[in-house]
């Protein structure tokens, strides 16, 4: 099949690779290059960069719905368009008469919106998955053609879940394209009574007071926000982003110390919460690199026994 691929984020990389191997990708459309890093160097999206490596024609429009770009994309006369983490809304005029499907990072109708993977982790869900849907006027409300699910591990962060869900993409996209080619594709209408929203993340959500939340809530929020914005705390006099934690039970929490209202960091990374305790596994000092809690404390043994206090991230 002739495929137009519209995507920007790394979530679509496994599916793009699979499509190149099994179909004819006639064009890739991605977001424009953006400044990145300390040097603010113009950098292509992960999809645009990989497409260029594969020798695929790449367009990077500021607005894919602009008349000239619309004509160019439609001019490929593809059999199907595959849309994954593209970042622009596709107009009715662009999609008119086109078979287009979208890979979404949740089991729809749950978690429609911008941050489905992070919200599933933050809500403490036991499982999540991906859905292949038709494109509709309302966000993520199209017909569901296929789904695939997987459990969310107790230590998994939203980054972990993102990467694992991305690997489910080729299977479900391949299934849908095959059924479309055979004329047997049927979609299921979403149950609006079960629809939930996955609103965009904000820096304000990254402030966490471990003395005021349970270990379960702390684990879910910290692991869900690990990539951005990250839950930052002050341990002694050092500001640290908590990247990965696990629950270690109420009994564990009873053995942990506290000073005033603030819990203390134990040598094994355990910190008491309002109910139970968490064990910090990975951290990133502000301005530094990510490391295990062991590596962090080996270089800063004075922080063992120090209070862990909430701080608001910059710009919150």
Model-derived regions, located:
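Short beta->alpha connector loops
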Residues: 8-11, 62-65, 86-89, 248
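Internal alpha/beta domain cores that form substrate/cofactor-binding pockets in large enzymes
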Residues: 2, 26-27, 57-76, 81, ...
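N-terminal Rossmann-like dinucleotide-binding module
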Residues: 1-39
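Acyl-group handling in specialized metabolite and lipid biosynthesis
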Residues: 199-213
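Donor/substrate-binding cores of folate-linked one-carbon enzymes
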Residues: 80-197, 204
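Structural motif corresponding to alpha-helix initiation and N-cap regions
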Residues: 13, 41-44, 66-70, 114
């Amino acid at each position: 099949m002739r495929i137009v691929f519209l995507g920007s984020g790394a979530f679509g990389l496994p599916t793009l690779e699979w499509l190149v191997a099994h179909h004819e990708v006639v064009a890739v459309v991605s977001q424009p290059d953006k400044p990145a890093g300390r040097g603010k160097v113009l950098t292509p999206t992960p999809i645009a960069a990989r497409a260029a490596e594969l020798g695929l024609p790449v367009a990077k429009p500021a607005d894919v719905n602009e008349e000239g770009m619309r004509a160019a994309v439609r001019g490929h006369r593809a059999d199907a368009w595959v849309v994954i983490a593209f970042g622009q809304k596709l107009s009715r005029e662009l999609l008119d008469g086109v078979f287009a499907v979208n890979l979404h990072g949740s089991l729809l109708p749950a978690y429609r919106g911008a941050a489905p993977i992070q919200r599933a982790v933050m809500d403490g869900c036991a499982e999540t998955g991906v859905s292949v849907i038709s494109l509709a006027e309302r966000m993520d409300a199209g017909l569901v053609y296929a789904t695939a699910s997987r459990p969310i591990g107790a230590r998994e962060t939203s980054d972990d879940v993102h990467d694992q869900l991305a690997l489910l993409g080729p299977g479900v996209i391949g299934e849908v394209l095959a059924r479309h080619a055979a004329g047997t594709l049927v979609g299921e209408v979403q149950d609006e009574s079960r629809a939930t929203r996955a609103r965009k993340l904000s820096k304000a959500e990254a402030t966490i007071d471990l003395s005021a939340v349970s270990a379960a809530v702390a684990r879910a929020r910290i692991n869900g926000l690990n990539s951005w914005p990250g839950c930052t705390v002050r341990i002694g006099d050092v500001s640290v982003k908590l990247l990965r934690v696990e629950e270690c039970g109420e009994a564990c929490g009873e053995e942990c110390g506290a000073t005033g209202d603030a819990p203390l960091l134990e040598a094994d990374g355990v910190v008491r919460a309002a109910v139970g305790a968490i064990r910090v596994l990975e951290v990133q000092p502000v301005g530094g690199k990510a490391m295990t809690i062991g590596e962090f404390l080996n270089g800063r043994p004075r922080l063992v026994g120090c209070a862990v206090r909430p701080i608001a991230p910059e710009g919150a």
